[in-house]
Amino acid sequence: MKHEFWHNAWKKSEQPGWQQKSVNPHLLKHWSASGAAESEVVFVPLCGRSLDMQWLHESGHHVIGIDLSVTALEQFCEQQSIDATCERDGPLTVFRAPGWTLYAGDFFKLEPDQLNRVSRVYDRAALIALPESMRADYARHLRNLLPSGTEIFAITITYDETQMDGPPFSVSEAEFQELFSSGYEIRVLQSESGPEQLGNLAARGLTTLRETATC
């Protein structure tokens, strides 16, 4: 997908369709059970201005995020009253504050030394934001960035793709296994289906979807 799609989406809408209004219930329910320690460095790829990041921060974690849109990160810092410094780090812009490191720019420009303290990944909206043609590259780059032993907590959705065009895109359990089974032991924490899982996607024509949390 072209960068302009995401830049325009953030500029045109105060509440983009993928932006959730509350913390993800799978995160609330399963984060501790997934094996997360009390204080970790957590990487949130394609983070936008997700409220999940604030919850992770308030839970004692240092949050490292990246999003293509500098607008999204500026809005997030303003909304959460984060007094961040802003500087260039190679091809990326970085916002820094106690407990926060937020990069603005292309995910594929990140380098391993920028994530060398990460022990856990929280992916709620990164993999499903990408079309199938980009997901293998995303997974490969993510694995190359992470220190050995890093755990991945991911939330994916599966739906009838004749009813709606992504993003967010449908990612099957089989595809997720194919992308991440090498080097990771994947455990399904919860998988639920039904119209009650739709949230704001009901307005786009979906009648049901399955949401799965894995670690």
Residue ranges of predicted features:
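A short SAM/SAH-binding and catalytic strip from SAM-dependent methyltransferases
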Residues: 107-111, 118-134
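Conserved acetyl-CoA-binding loop of GNAT-fold acetyltransferases
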Residues: 61
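Class I SAM-dependent methyltransferase "Motif I" SAM/SAH-binding loop
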Residues: 43-50, 126
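Class I (Rossmann-like) S-adenosyl-L-methionine-dependent methyltransferase catalytic domain
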Residues: 1-39, 49-52, 65-100, 104-114, ...
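Gly/Ala-rich phosphate-binding loop of Rossmann-like dinucleotide-binding domains
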Residues: 57-58
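Generic beta-sheet signal
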Residues: 40-42, 119
